[in-house]
Regions:
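Bacterial Sec-dependent N-terminal signal peptides
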Residues: 1-23
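Buried hydrophobic residues that stabilize the cores of well-folded domains
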Residues: 19-326
Length: 326
């Protein structure tokens, strides 16, 4: 199911200052909000740090030192992002001095080893053109970089997208100078306005042949209500439907796919009296998988933390946010 969801970010955006993050995560199983540009610029945010801990029912909080970090420029554009993940365990040497009692050594110096977490950190850097559109997204994972290059048409739609595996030829690893570059994939997109409420996007492979088609539906207020995806040479289909409440807020998202049999995933939203997302429930089929609860500062109304209840694992993911400002 996950491979269908990434393209949804192309055209979905809800730029309300009251709404601090978009209700369209690129990954249905992601535990992070996608902060909106109006939220960043309105509050003059420079950096956001997220500290992540995990707690199983009837157990103490487990802090593995996991974190995420977003860095923005003064125009609200995301410049850098990184996240840490646990790679495994390593042994750390611990030196123990000799033990003396009444001037007499009763235990000699010793060495012991204790397990500690080993981390992987993925860094992503973003580059923009004069129209403030992303043209390069470069992610470093170890010695290699996965880089996506974007080109746009006159209407601001992504027209070409190329993904490369790259190396850094610079001796200073904090500076990037292109070394070896290998093409991994290349796509082109063509757009057709069918009517005032419908638009079609064709996905072309590196041979210029259409392999996928996306049809977007909008209401009379310009809000997207449905997205249908279909592959040209296979039976696979997927759709996303958005339902809005009387205040124009997303009330429900429904995702369906036949990629692995008939699958459905649904998100339901409740809001505070201040028009902020309060609770989000995510279902797979009829089973509740995750329940999000969002906590805000009473005075600034900024997001301070959110809790993700994993119903099947009987556990909670706790994410706390801290900010730096311009």
């Amino acid at each position: 199911m996950r491979c269908w969801l990434t393209p949804l970010l192309f055209l979905l955006s809800f730029p309300s200052i009251a709404q601090q993050f978009e209700l369209n995560p690129a990954d249905y199983y992601s535990f992070e909000p996608v902060f909106t540009k109006p939220y960043i610029t309105h509050n003059r945010i420079k950096t956001i740090r997220a500290a992540i801990v995990y707690k199983r029912d009837n157990e103490a909080i487990e802090d593995k030192g996991l974190s995420k970090y977003w860095e923005y420029d003064s125009a609200g554009l995301l410049n850098r992002y990184y996240m840490t993940s646990v790679r495994g365990y390593i042994s750390r040497e611990v030196q123990h001095p000799a033990v003396f009692r009444k001037g007499k050594r009763i235990f000699p110096p010793s060495v012991s080893y204790e397990p500690v977490y080993a981390y992987d950190t993925t860094f992503t850097t973003y580059y923009y053109n004069r129209q403030k559109q992303i043209i390069i997204r470069r992610s470093r994972d170890g010695d290699y970089y996965n880089t996506v290059y974007y080109e746009y048409d006159g209407d601001g739609n992504v027209e070409k997208q190329s993904t490369f595996r790259e190396t850094n030829a610079s001796e200073n690893k904090n500076l990037f100078r292109l070394g070896v570059q290998n093409l991994l994939s290349k796509e082109e997109f063509r757009y057709e306005r069918i009517s005032s409420t419908q638009m079609r996007r064709q996905h072309m492979n590196d041979e210029g042949k259409e392999y996928k088609q996306t049809l977007f539906h909008y209401d009379n207020q310009g809000r997207m209500t449905e997205e249908n995806n279909s592959f040209t040479v296979s039976w696979m289909r997927a759709s996303l439907k958005l339902d809005y409440d009387n205040n124009g807020r997303i009330h429900e998202k429904l995702f369906t796919s036949n990629e692995n049999g008939d699958e459905t995933a649904k998100s339901e939203y409740k809001y505070t009296a201040d028009n902020l997302v309060d609770v989000e429930k995510r279902y797979k089929g009829d089973q509740l998988f995750y329940e999000y609860n969002y906590i805000y500062d009473r005075q600034s109304r900024m997001l301070t933390s959110h809790f993700v209840r994993e119903d099947l694992n009987k556990a909670i993911v706790i994410v706390r946010y801290t900010y730096e400002y311009y």
